[in-house]
Design a protein with these regions (language model features):
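Generic N-terminal helix/loop capping motif
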Residues: 75-82, 86, 306, 310, ...
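Boundary at the C-terminal end of the N-terminal hydrophobic targeting segment
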Residues: 17-22
Length: 428
């Protein structure tokens, strides 16, 4: 598994074309985002990195430089990104790929709308934000001490980060490759977008993984022909690791972990961001051309299926991370009066206890063009209240629908008034 931005590739699995077709009925063509309707390159970002730069320029925030880690730790703190989110990728899939090896993996940190990549000794930090209107926006930050650090927007990244694999919009992708002992990827072994629908056993090729997962297998921690041959004889000989000390020296890294649960959240999140960017772009273009979104209804249904995890690959064993990421993430809320939250994990049969994406609270969702946002909220209400009994959402039990509905009623701002009504069919 690996991440591209600035040449980042988030690598994992084997279901590429099928995923894209399921999402957009095969419409993986590039969106003309350089044209006036979107005007990606000409439009300044208003995302988290752009806002942080403004605060730095006004003197409201001062980043601290460390001789060993550069701006890394101070930047994580300024953006409220926990070091517990660290995941480690050793496949050579980055702008600075020559510096990445199994001995010097790239550390990837993230929160709901920012990704940061750090490589020991590398000249720049690789940074990506999710702008609510533009989607993925990519930056570098020179690892040189200065009184006024500057994030430099780099559209060169779109050579990899705007393709059918990112749903035709500026975005991110997670994939899984076998690598040799130097981290060079084998493109034949599975070049596919990975998210919560990908079977567990196909994930994390090219990544280190810490955490327990019973008899279930994955591709993590393996590099070189000998390791993969051993994995055929003893499938979990590098699985269920709670420490990476025998595999790599992580002195100087923010954490000694590459948390399994953090990886699972990362792969869900990256594809969600691409999905919502595509919806945003398509809605803008449809309204410009037709003044309606009737042609986008099937795309909306695909998004709702992803939002509600209806095609999630079931877990075959209980999984547990090692960095404390799960507890940190779950604590972020928001919570209803009963203490329930969409960030609560299950980790036995599925990722989340209440399968509705926490990113429904995101700025990107709230800033969808009004016709699309209203349509999605209406359809979501129909599903959660049991008015929609279609087989596409049959994986959601009446009890689960009711719980999600109650959580959203108490925690999601600016819901339409009809969401407050008590009519719930078959969910008592």
């Amino acid at each position: 598994m690996a991440i591209w931005w600035m040449g980042w590739l988030v690598v994992m699995g084997t279901v590429a074309g099928a995923v894209a077709q399921a999402d957009f009925q095969g419409a993986t063509h590039m969106v003309p985002f350089e044209e006036d309707t979107i005007s990606y390159n000409k439009t300044p970002s208003t995302g988290p990195i752009a806002r942080l730069q403004s605060r730095i320029d006004r003197g409201e925030v001062k980043l601290k430089y460390d001789p060993k880690s550069g701006w890394r730790d101070s930047l994580l703190e300024a953006l409220a990104i926990s070091p517990k989110s660290q995941t480690l990728v050793f496949s050579k899939t980055s702008l600075q790929r020559e510096r990445i090896t199994p001995a010097t993996p790239r550390a990837v940190f993230f929160n709901d709308d920012v990704y940061i990549g750090w490589i020991p000794g590398a000249p720049v930090l690789e940074i990506s934000e999710v702008d609510a209107k533009l989607g993925g926006v990519f930056y570098t930050l020179e690892q040189t001490e200065t009184a006024q650090p500057k994030f430099v927007r780099n559209n060169q990244c779109l050579e990899c980060h705007a393709s059918a694999k990112t749903m035709g919009v500026p975005g991110h992708l997670i994939r899984s490759f076998k690598t040799d002992d130097q981290g060079i990827i084998d493109l034949i072994t599975g070049v596919s977008e990975v998210n919560h629908r990908t079977p567990f056993e196909d994930r994390w090729g090219g990544w280190y993984v810490t955490g327990t997962h019973g008899k279930a297998t994955h591709r993590g921690n393996l590099h070189g022909k000998a390791a993969f041959q051993m994995a055929e004889e003893k499938p979990n000989f590098l699985g269920n690791l709670t420490s990476l000390k025998k595999l790599v020296d992580l002195e100087g890294y923010a954490s000694p972990h590459s948390d399994l649960v953090a990886l699972m959240v990362l792969e869900h999140e990256a594809h969600f961001h691409n999905f919502i960017t595509r919806l945003h772009y398509e809605t803008q273009m449809a309204m410009s051309r037709y003044q309606h979104i009737r042609y986008l209804r099937s795309m909306g249904e695909g998004f709702l299926k992803y939002l509600l995890f209806t095609e999630e690959a079931p877990l075959k064993a209980r999984v547990k991370g090692t960095a404390g990421f799960a507890d940190h993430f779950a604590s972020l809320g928001p919570k209803d009066r009963r203490g329930r939250s969409l960030r609560q994990f299950d980790l036995e049969a599925r990722l989340f206890k209440y399968p509705c994406s926490f990113l429904i609270y995101s700025e990107a969702f709230d800033m969808l063009p009004r016709p699309m946002r209203e349509h999605l909220l209406q359809r979501l209400h129909e599903i959660l209240t049991g008015q929609d009994t279609s087989p596409e959402f049959a994986t959601l039990s009446p009890e689960t629908r009711r719980a999600i509905l109650e959580i959203l009623r108490e925690t999601k701002l600016n819901l339409p008034d009809y969401w407050r009504a008590e009519s719930v069919s078959g969910a008592r």
